[in-house]
């Protein structure tokens, strides 16, 4: 949990740069969740986007990646939409998070805004299909 100090990963970030890095991902047919974490971390590094991995927003609220006010949460498969929405609400209730990008393997419907903050869903299966082994 950042107490207001400036760090390399909490400088304001351009969401479009983050989305460009994420849309370059090509997932194999059955990646594990931590394989997806590794791929996302590598995509951010290749794009020159500093980030914090497993960032603690508050007690019991640890988002997968934090990039200057933008959170990125990764879910393998097709998560339960209701549970995912509750998790997104908990994260977006934190002042430090201005918006969230949810990366899922399968399309999972989420509202465009939660608590007045933008929610963007990136489906890996829609990024030109899944790369077969």
Label for each model-derived stretch:
Residues 2-12, 121-133:
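Non-catalytic C-terminal interaction segments of nucleic acid-processing enzymes
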Residues 41, 88-89:
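Short amphipathic alpha-helical segments and helix-helix/interface helices
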Residues 78-83, 92-126:
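Nucleic-acid nuclease catalytic cores
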Residues 5-56:
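Acidic-basic catalytic patches of nuclease active cores, encompassing PD-(D/E)XK
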Residues 58-59, 84-87:
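Amphipathic coiled-coil/heptad-repeat helices and related helical stalk/stem segments
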Residues 65-78, 91:
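Conserved catalytic cores of phosphodiester-cleaving nucleases, focusing on short active-site segments
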């Amino acid at each position: 949990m950042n107490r207001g100090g400036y760090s390399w990963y909490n400088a304001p970030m351009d969401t479009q740069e983050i989305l460009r890095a994420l849309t370059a991902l090509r997932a194999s047919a059955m990646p594990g969740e931590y394989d997806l974490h590794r791929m996302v971390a590598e995509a951010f590094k290749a794009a020159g986007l500093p980030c914090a991995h497993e960032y603690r927003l508050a007690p019991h609220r640890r988002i997968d990646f934090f990039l200057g006010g933008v959170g990125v949460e990764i879910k393998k498969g097709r998560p339960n939409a209701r549970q995912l929405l509750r998790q997104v609400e908990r994260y977006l209730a934190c002042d430090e998070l201005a918006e969230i990008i949810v990366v899922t393997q399968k399309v999972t419907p989420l509202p465009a805004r939660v608590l007045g903050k933008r929610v963007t869903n990136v489906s890996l299966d829609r990024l030109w299909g899944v790369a077969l082994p």
